[in-house]
Amino acid sequence: MKLTARRQARELALQVLFQTEFAPQISYQTFLEVFEQSLDPEVITYADLIVTGVKSNKEAIDSKIQASSAHWKVERMATIDRNILRIAVYEMRFAADPIKENIAINEAVEIAKKYGTSDSGSFVNGLLDQVGKAH
């Protein structure tokens, strides 16, 4: 899968995770179905893998994030930042085929710059760096 397809999948996974936090009564598959006609099937498949992985490992992922965050509780982090962190930690630590930390961190930072606040990129970078060092 090309990097751009993976980036699209991560961005889609972020959108789905974000939406399901505000509408937990709607299944995440419903949100993915909205994009099925407009995106490459491999993007949908990888996004589904990420969302499923994050949801299945949410407690352990949040525990790793919390252990690396000296000043922020996971539930108090901005929803976008929290879900970007979850995606990156899933891909680094919980995926069946984990990706390299530097790739996960770079992807997360770029997505944070695109979707988060002006501080999101540096926040995500610093926290994921701590997650990497804690491993």
Curated annotation (Swiss-Prot):
One term of GO molecular function: RNA binding
Keywords: RNA-binding, Transcription, Transcription antitermination, Transcription regulation
InterPro entries, alphabetized: NusB-like_sf, NusB_fam, NusB_RsmB_TIM44
Pfam families: NusB
Any GO BP: transcription antitermination
Record keyword Transcription present: yes
Disulfide linkage: none
Organism superkingdom: Bacteria
Gene3D superfamilies, per the entry: NusB-like
Cellular component terms (Gene Ontology): cytosol
Family as reported in the entry's similarity comment: Belongs to the NusB family.
Function comment: Involved in transcription antitermination. Required for transcription of ribosomal RNA (rRNA) genes. Binds specifically to the boxA antiterminator sequence of the ribosomal RNA (rrn) operons.
Protein name: Transcription antitermination protein NusB
Protein's organism: Bdellovibrio bacteriovorus (strain ATCC 15356 / DSM 50701 / NCIMB 9529 / HD100)
Lineage: Bacteria, Pseudomonadati, Bdellovibrionota, Bdellovibrionia, Bdellovibrionales
Gene, per the UniProt record: nusB
